[in-house]
Structure formats: structure tokens, C-alpha cells
């Protein structure tokens, strides 16, 4: 919402025609002979060798999957293998001119890209650097295996290291590049510029965009390539990523020194099929995929179709597009046409295409075609071809023998996986040697000045401080965010209304004055891209604070939260960190699509930390904890609470402090019943506790589960052992809620101490109704008291106002409500 950009009605209503530029198709006209002077014979020969290496690697996997052996060595590989036989030229041509600082992210079919980029890096790095990388990576576990039988040639040793590390990873071995936790579809090796490959179609698009954002914001060298297939053009996150990468603010609103597009190439490896569907002609609208660029920005993303069966054509395209990126003219769209001779996977019989089509493409086999060009240019002869093929088979047999041997390459003990779900590292700054870029000193920030005049105590002389004078929950969010911005120069924040507007519910009001555009900006209303780019930014080594305005919007970012944010730390064996805090606001009064509490969804997903603070003190302390850690945190906030003051602690300190994840907060001490709450329901539970004590003489332990995962059960169990009775309540729908999970564990851990089963009082299993009747949907104090009376402890003289009976519960479940 920049006031500098005026939307003029006269201009916007003018008649006219939108022009579209031409999209080049397969324009490269040179050959090996023509490029001999440019690249030299050795480099041109290296292209051939790398293509041979990839072909043999993939053929080996094909043989293992279909015949159970390779070169006489038997092996049963139970995992997946999505092969790129036939696509070698596109991978090698792309990697040919890339530097180590250029990063690639791929798909489920990226073995070839891993090897191509790895070999490119090996050729560009000096021997000392290579030895240092190999010896240091994973404590040298992978290197020691290949070093035993390796020679003195460091480049050859590095090649063996690359082959073994990748293959051991595919086979799920502890010496693999990711400890065997990534496997075939997720293998990667950051020291060579190979970032995670992704099993989700199109999954690398927004992650790569975030990686490019990191490079731009932090002024890092190199570009980023998202290698995704033609089928990914049918995925919403791919479109969101291209739009995000093309935002005009990069050129028009960011500071002068930061202007220019993101350094990213969206490279669509177009092999013409997505599973069993043919893209152009059947499942997509385009004829040429490159045409899509015209719909994204006025430059048509500099889109181009490139002949991916000619490695030199691909290398030429990368060279030209790199120059555009250096000029700040990214993003780029490349359609690299190629063809897979094998099926989608070894079990695919290719019943959706005819034999003649496959044979037609095989007649243009890129390896054979390129070998002929090398021969015609006097660089390679038949004897040399045979020799190189023999060398590749020998290297592959050696790597396969080592990777398939359980004594040499054991599997990671399963019990160690638990220790790799989180990195759990304290990171005050991800670039401690750099000063954060700020527009104002802390004491000059207008909101910080205003907060200095507010009461940090919510209660004075037994009376609550008025809303306009008290330090509120939203102020706690602001202070924690500003502190980390002033500490960590890599930290950025973005979302749908972060700049100028002041963030959702005014939590960021005052940040715009302190932060340059590249550290705080508005994103498109693209929840998948918001979370996906945050993942990529974090994987590159930066801290991100992003928000979804309403919890209900998490569905738009389901894959990015459940499969990307949650899993990359553990799939990398914590080589990578994921310092992303995702703020999620839980609404009320806004109906069925804006008033849901989905804590249970993310609590179910391994790899996420989930918190839901309900007081200003906890909000600031827990956000400080999240923003000083290395793990992904889903940070729930209730819209009911943004304007409340601190009612439990003496005050909210102005100084920095942290509230640890895990322990629940005890808000009330009693002896008769344990009440456990999540979120804003805690305040209604306290109302119920007051009524129970005043009217019935029943006192309650009241716990606030501000940390959902992790959760320390010891205080809860100690309370239940004292009271023998427990009721749990939150604003989430009752069915499948976090409360049932907590209640179930309490039953297991304190069964002998319970006088009655744990009782859950959640919201009704309906859609959220209009604001006027929300009291019939969300838990109320009377609901809690009725449930206690009917199912836990009869209260003398109490009359039910609701129907909390088990019979009613059975009836509702029978009806699905």
C-alpha cells in the first residue's frame, strides 16, 4: 500500500492493447567445432564424461530395480528411483558454467542434476578446497569410505566421493549425504551448491524463490535455479512463486541500492509428461510452456525454449540469462525440452505412449549426438569413447559396491532419528559480523517511545489498567520482533499487510519506520509462497518471520507447512536449519472460514514446534525464544487477546527475556480439579474456577498449555495426582483436538490416580456461526461447570444449562457432529 504509487482512474480506464514480446524457440545454432575456441577441448570433453556418468548412474539404478543386480553384484533396493535416462544433456549443459555459489534445487527426478552440478563444482574448486569440504562434511564419515581405496588425484577422489555419497543416500545409509534420511527424491549436497531436491511436484519453485530472496537481501553472490518439470506448471505454488519473484516492488519501491529482480531461473525440464498425462495437448492449456512467461510480467520473464538435447545450447542459455540476472532483470523462465527414455519410475510400463515415439527420441540420443560432434571436431575417437565408458563403469561399480555393503555403509540406527527432528540451537544472529540495517535507532522509534509511557502491569491496586494505557499483547509481539531485527541482520518479515498497514491487528505498527523495505515488505496474498519462500530463505542461512492473517488460511499453505517447513531439518540430518517463525492468528466473530483453531493439524506433524501464548508476558518471551532458535515454530495468537494487559506476572519487562518452550503455566492453584486450557479459553476457565470456588467450594489447578509441542507433562501429572480429576478446554472443535491428545496421555501416565476419565470441552463440531451466536459454539464457563457436574464431580444444587452427558456425546458422534 505505498502512498507513492497513485492509482489514477483516468490512466487505468484508457483504451488500448497490451503488447506481448516474441518468445525465442531453440535459437542456438553453433556446435562443438564452433565452441572449441570459447571453452577449450578439455571442458568440452568434460561435458561428454559427465553425461556418461549420469547415464551409467541411472542405468545402474534401473538394473537394480528391474533385475536386482548391477555388474554381478546383487542388491534389493526397496526405495524409489525416478530416472532421467535421456535427460543428461539438459543437466550437464545447465551446470557447465555455474559457479559453486550458484545454487540449484530440483525435483524427484534430479539425480542427474546432482551429479552434473557436483562435477561442475569439482572442476572449479581447487584441490585444497575439495579436500577440506570432503573431510569436514559429516565429520568425514563419507570421505573415509572412498579415501581408503582412492588414489592421489584429488579430482578423481572427489568424483568418487560424489558418486558414493549420492548413492549411499539413495540407499538410505548413514554415510550418505543426508545420513540416509533424504533418500532418492530429496538428496542434496550444499558445499557444491546443490540444495534440496523435492518429492512434491513443483515444491522447489517457492523454496528456490526464497533462496534467491536471501541472496538479494543479504547481497550474496550467485544465482538460484529451480529445476522443476513441465507438470509443475499445473501446481498453484509454482505460479505463486513466479509471481512472488516478479513483484514490481523489487524494481520500484526497494531502496535504490537494492533494486532489481530476484536472481532466479525457473527452469522447466519439459519431458512432455506428468505421470501418465501428456502436458501440452492433454493436461495443460499451453502449446509451448515458455509462452506462460508472458502472463507474469511485461518482460515475459525473458522466457525462452531451449533444446535440452544439446548441452551447448543449454550452457549458452544459462550464460545469456546469467547476464540478465547480473543486470537485475530476473526472474527468468527457461523451458528446457528433453525426454525420458524410461518410465516415470521402474514400475511404469509407459502404456500412455507408443514405442515409436520413444524410439524417435532415442535416435537423437544426446550422448551419441554429442560424441559425434566431438569426433567431427577431432576431440574424441572411438578408442577414447570406449575407454571413457569403461572408466565410468568401473567408478560406478566401485561406488555401488561400497554403498550396498552394510558393513561399509550401515544404516542410521532408527533411534537416532528422534535426535534429528530439531536442531535446537541458539542463534542470536545468523551473521554476527554484520550490522543490521535500520532506519532508526531503537530509542527513536515512535512506537517504542509510546510504549515507554504505557503501564507494563495489567493490574494496579487490584484494578485492571484501561486498554489505552496498558501494554498490550500486540505490543509484546512488536517488541520481540523489533529486538530481533536490531540483533540479526539476516532477519526479514513479510506477509499480506506487513508494511505501512502495520501488520495484522497492528502488531507491526512502528516497524515500517525502523526498517528498510528489503527487511519488511508486503507479499502477495499467496500463502503457499509466503511459507515456501520462508523455507528457502531459511535453508540459505537467514531468519524469517512470516504471518498468515488467519489460521484458516493455513490450508492454502498445507504442503509448505506440512512437507517443507516441517521436514527439511530432519531430512538433512540437521545439516540445514529452519529458523522460520510462522505467526498464525486465530479469529472469532468472522464466521466459518475465519474463526478456526487448527493447532491440532500442525501438532500432528513431526518437525514443528507449536506454541499458543495467551498473555502479553508469554507472547513476548515465547516470540523471543522462537526468534533466537534454529527450528520452525508455529506461533498461534488469539485475536480475542491482542488488546489485553498482563494479569498474571507483575509486569511485562522492557528488557529482553525468554520463556522456554515446554512447561505449561499454572495460573491458579487449587486442590479439587485440574483444568487444562489452550489459548484464549484460559480466561473462561478462570471464570469457571471462580464460580466453582465461590458457589460450590471447589478449587482448581488451572494450567495454560502455552507450549503445545514440546509439552512438559510433569506439572500436569503432579496436579492430577493431587486432584484425581481433569477437564481440558480450548476454542478448537472438540473432535480430533489437541485436548484429546493431552487427555489421552494423562490417562496413560496417571491412570491409577484418576477418579474419572479426562473430560474435553471444546467447540462444537460445526461450522463457526455468526458473531451473535458464537456463545453457542465456543466453550463458555457454564459448559465447563456443567461437564464437571455431570461427568466428574456432582455439584450440590447445580442445575445443568447444557447437555454434557455421554449419551449426548454418543448421539453427536453418530451424527458426525
Language-model-derived ranges and their functions:
Residues 89, 192-410, 492, 510, 577-578, 639-817, ...:
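Thiamine diphosphate
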Residues 44, 48, 77-78, 99-103, ...:
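Short coil/turn connectors at secondary-structure junctions
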Residues 590-676:
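Phosphate/diphosphate-binding glycine-rich loops and adjacent basic-rich segments that engage nucleotide
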Residues 60-61, 172-188, 218-219, 290-291, ...:
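Acidic-glycine-rich active-site phosphate/pyrophosphate-binding loop
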Residues 63, 67, 72-264, 274-300, ...:
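Cofactor-binding active-site loop characterized by glycine-rich and histidine/acidic residues
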Residues 1-90, 131-132, 142, 341-515, ...:
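Conserved acidic/glycine
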